[in-house]
């Protein structure tokens, strides 16, 4: 993503449950909610579900992009993530599985290294400014 591109998301309560929302972003419509155990109706993913999905999606796409650039025989990439809040620290764990019988051990290792360079991960690890108006 270029540095000057602005992405806008619009979120509106739907009334389906106490926390249910409709999400419009970049021409896509999504639903969000909290699980019933948190007072929601579980009509869609919760905010941290979306955060994990964003990190996983970006990771898979970054690995695929790199394999394409290198013309490596990557058949499929899978990303499994967990999130846990420990005190004031958010801990994420990513498990990357790269499939491809013709990939060398060196290529597999490089793809795992590249997985840590996805833009969403860099955003989460970097300096972020949020302005509320």
Labelled PLM ranges:
Residues 1-53, 61-133:
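Extended beta-strand/beta-hairpin segments
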């Amino acid at each position: 993503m270029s540095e000057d591109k602005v992405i806008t998301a619009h979120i509106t309560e739907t009334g389906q449950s106490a926390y249910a929302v409709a999400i419009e972003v970049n021409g896509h419509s999504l639903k969000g909610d909290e699980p019933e155990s948190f007072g929601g109706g579980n009509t869609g993913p919760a905010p941290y579900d979306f955060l994990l999905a964003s990190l996983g999606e970006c990771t898979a796409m970054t690995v695929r992009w790199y394999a394409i650039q290198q013309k490596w025989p990557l058949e499929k990439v899978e990303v499994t993530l967990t999130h846990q809040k420990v005190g004031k620290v958010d801990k994420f764990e990513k498990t990357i599985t790269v499939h491809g019988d013709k990939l060398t051990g060196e290529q597999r290792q490089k793809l795992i290294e590249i997985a840590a360079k996805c833009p969403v991960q860099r955003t989460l690890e970097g300096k972020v400014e949020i302005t509320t108006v």
